[in-house]
Amino acid sequence: MTGGISPHPINATPEIQEITNTVKEQLEKKLGTNYSIFQAISYKKQLVNGMNYFIKVKTDNGYDHIRVYEAFKGTPNLVSVQQHKSLEDDITYF
């Protein structure tokens, strides 16, 4: 059953870091930058026809929130990004 975004952030797992690593190059291309620091911190998720992951990522420039869509039998793809976030900023739907 599909639904809203999970209410509370979950600490990033190795699986979430792997998803984050998969879209790193997509994000770097989109923003025209290269990251030496790219660490998933926490995330929320939303079940759709696949899974949306809303991931807080620590980067060289602070924190970004990225939205990644992964089809049930597909490859994760970057959907959007919110830059200039802080560690304290809540992860919300975007």
From Swiss-Prot:
Molecular function GO terms recorded: cysteine-type endopeptidase inhibitor activity
Signal peptide limits: none
Domain of life of the source: Eukaryota
Extent of motif Secondary area of contact: 46-50
Compartment(s) where it occurs, according to its Swiss-Prot or TrEMBL record: Cytoplasm
Family matches, as InterPro entries: Cystatin_dom (IPR000010), Cystatin_sf (IPR046350), Prot_inh_stefin (IPR001713)
Residues passing through the membrane, by range: none
Keyword Cytoplasm: yes
GO-annotated cellular components: cytosol
Protein keywords: Cytoplasm, Protease inhibitor, Thiol protease inhibitor
SMART domains in the record: CY
UniProt site (Reactive site): 3
BP term (GO), one: hyperosmotic response
Protein task: Intracellular thiol proteinase inhibitor.
Family according to the record: Belongs to the cystatin family.
Identification of the protein by name: Cystatin-A3
Record organism: Dictyostelium discoideum
Gene behind the chain: cpiC
